[in-house]
């Protein structure tokens, strides 16, 4: 076998867990960094990817987010901001968004197509109301903030979330 995958979950078919991999194609560790290597590998040699997901019966993996991005809801629910962001980003007039936890409330930061438009705040608020009708109570957006410029990104074009928390 070239690569093995497992989900670290009590029920990987129904409950999200961390996706872990093992095989000849997986790195053996970080160069001259034993501490980082120990942190990323389990005791039995599986590499923690940091991705969270589930399996289906055919062996397909469904990624729901990153463990470091997960937000713990008010009653201990796992909230995956990427899933909410995908919905926001598909709405008219939205270029990109991130969902953050501020004082135990979910806030959507949205960069719109036309940040200078006088109606943009009202439009994004209407999007929030519509979106919340599709979401469980614990993952509903409490407020929206329109940001005037694109989010700062990594070289791989991922939003630098830590700048906006």
List each model region and its residues:
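Conserved AMP-binding/adenylate-forming
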Residues: 1-61, 67-70, 85
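Generic structural signal for well-ordered beta-strand positions
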Residues: 15, 56, 62, 79, ...
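AMP-binding/adenylate-forming catalytic core of the ANL superfamily
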Residues: 23, 28-29, 52-137
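Conserved C-terminal "lid"/linker of ANL adenylate-forming enzymes
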Residues: 104, 129-165
